[in-house]
Regions:
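A cross-family kinase active-site recognition segment
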Residues: 2-3, 119-169, 186-188
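Juxta-kinase regulatory segment immediately upstream of eukaryotic protein kinase catalytic domains
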Residues: 2-48
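A conserved alpha-helical element in kinase catalytic cores
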Residues: 69-111, 117-137
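Activation segment
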Residues: 75, 118, 207, 215-217, ...
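All-alpha amphipathic helical-bundle segments outside canonical DNA-binding/catalytic cores
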Residues: 252-262
């Protein structure tokens, strides 16, 4: 087990609060992000180049701005929340933080970070484990936002029929209540919140974590749970999973809180699927069967 200083407290008090990172409305996309950049330009450093291409577009739009990356969030994103994370993690050697405060505009919230030069072979899961350990060690004890799991759920179910919405809202409440009793072997402290190889980039001779939107104070095991789910689903073989665990110094499979974290992830997946179907104009004919599973959340 890694020698981590345990976070204060022995139980989690997950927050129910307005969503700081809402999902975008249907129709929002690259054109809005470019318009947001133009509106934000007077507030950005002069060295930030005009976007030359799109690096990614889904719940946010990521633009190639030469030596910088411009990430644009949909309208309604809490710029203060983003700034709180990047200010607290300022100077990090394990993660890439924003260069300037977030700039809210009518078309979206604009952030800028340095561009991590692409190159080299894909990051391995062993490197992810090592990068995550460095991140936890470096950022332990920092005043990051309280964890707010499933914060996107209320907005996404608000237009469902009342009975359907109530099933998912009740499931969320049950899971949040159960989380208050979770005990952690690794401590309650700073987590990355969205661990995957796609959020770890090669940076010179080392690697760096990116996409810090979900940084929060939570059981550190939460950051290990995604790898364990990939292993248990067959997406990751045993040798790869073991390499991740060895690099971090801990295997989460024996943790009593893991089944609950799985259910939180499952419900978050339902919320995302509802949004994705609406965003792309697909129907929700799968939802009634899914709701039957959530009448008994645990």
């Amino acid at each position: 087990m890694p020698q981590l200083a345990p976070g204060a407290g022995t139980a989690l008090d997950p927050m129910v609060r307005p969503c700081a990172l809402p999902l975008p409305p249907a129709g929002w996309g690259v054109a809005d992000a470019l318009a947001a950049f133009e509106a934000a330009r007077p507030s950005l450093p002069p060295g930030v180049a005009a976007p030359a291409g799109v690096l990614g577009a889904l719940t946010t739009v990521v633009l190639d701005a030469g030596e910088h990356v411009v990430k644009v969030y949909p309208p309604g994103t809490d710029a203060d929340h983003l700034d709180a994370i990047h200010t607290v993690l300022g100077g990090s050697t394990s993660a890439t933080v924003s260069c300037v405060p977030a700039v809210p505009t009518v078309r979206g919230v604009v952030t800028v970070s340095r561009r991590v030069p692409p190159g080299g072979s894909p990051v391995t899961w062993a490197e992810v484990g090592a990068a995550l350990l460095r991140f936890h060690l470096e950022n332990g004890g920092r005043s990051v936002p309280a964890w707010a799991p499933l914060s996107r759920l209320p907005a996404e179910v608000s237009s469902l029929p009342d009975e359907q919405a109530e099933v998912l809202l009740t499931a969320r409440d049950v899971l949040l209540a159960a989380l208050s009793g979770v005990r952690s072997e690794l401590g309650f402290d700073t987590i990355h919140g969205d661990v995957s190889p796609s959020n770890v980039l090669r940076d010179g001779r080392g690697v760096t974590l990116i996409d810090l939107d979900w940084v929060a104070r939570a059981p550190r095991e939460y950051d290990l749970a995604s790898a364990s789910r990939r292993f248990r689903s067959g997406e990751m073989d045993r040798a790869t999973y073991r390499s991740f665990c060895r690099a971090y110094g801990h295997d989460v499979l024996g943790w009593e809180g893991l089944p609950l974290m799985d259910r939180v992830a499952d419900l978050a997946g339902v919320v995302f699927r509802i949004w994705d179907c609406r965003f792309h104009g697909r129907d929700l004919d799968w939802l009634p069967d899914e709701l039957r599973l959530w009448r008994t959340p645990l």
